[in-house]
């Protein structure tokens, strides 16, 4: 299985540690998703790229409050909500997605442009930016193979309980596969933000080599990061 990644993703992983996540020592920023669930901290102000962090947090809040009004326009998916270079970053890679069970790492770009999709995975504009927080659903699209790399080719091997990791500019977010869906391309409601939840949704064409007749969704819910758990990875 060829799971090569774009070089910028490797560079991203090599320097992302210089921009650590800064936890809230007061413990005041938390959300209880369910009385039975562990408490997951809400995002708190980091010490790197603060202006970008606030702008993106406001973007996530605004699209939720406005009901993602432009999500039914396919051209809206492509237009990047932010350009990293406008905030002093040399690369347009915002994050890296790691799927241990698939031995896969891919860069994540903002906006599903032709070039971004050729270079890796892409967040669909008008969906949440993958940086955590309640009332978010970052939809991350990938081809089922491109230019000799597999990308999301084997995404149908994922099962409920498998882990998906997002490493962005500020922190490492851990998610667990909770649901698999096969939908029609016009079923936009299936990728909307779900109030009170903290999700990412992986999206690709289905069936493989079908010309995109349907969409394959892998819905993942945020889980606490426990370094000593079975999910911990090198």
Region spans (language model):
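Solvent-exposed, non-transmembrane regions of membrane-associated and secreted proteins
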Residues: 1-159, 163-234
């Amino acid at each position: 299985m060829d799971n090569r990644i774009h070089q910028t993703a490797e560079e991203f992983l090599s320097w992302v540690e210089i921009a650590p996540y800064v936890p809230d020592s007061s413990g005041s920023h938390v959300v209880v998703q369910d009385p039975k669930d562990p408490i997951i901290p809400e995002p708190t102000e980091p010490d790197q790229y603060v202006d970008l962090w606030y702008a993106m947090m406001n973007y996530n809040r605004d699209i939720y409050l406005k009901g993602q009004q432009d999500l039914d326009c396919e051209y809206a998916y492509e237009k990047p909500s932010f350009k990293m270079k406008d905030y002093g970053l040399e690369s347009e890679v915002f994050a890296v997605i790691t799927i241990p069970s698939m031995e896969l790492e891919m860069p994540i770009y903002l906006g599903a442009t032709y070039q971004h999709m050729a270079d890796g995975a892409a967040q669909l504009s008008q969906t949440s930016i993958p940086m955590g927080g309640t009332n978010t659903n970052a939809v991350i699209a990938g081809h089922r193979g491109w230019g000799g790399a597999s990308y999301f080719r084997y995404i149908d091997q994922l099962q409920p309980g498998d882990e998906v990791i997002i490493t962005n500019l500020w922190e490492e977010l851990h998610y667990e596969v909770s649901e698999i869906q096969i939908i029609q391309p016009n079923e936009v409601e299936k990728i909307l933000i779900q109030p009170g939840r903290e999700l990412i949704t992986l999206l690709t064409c289905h069936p493989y080599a079908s010309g995109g007749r349907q969409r394959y969704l892998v819905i993942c819910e945020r889980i606490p990061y426990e370094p000593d758990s079975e999910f911990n990875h090198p």
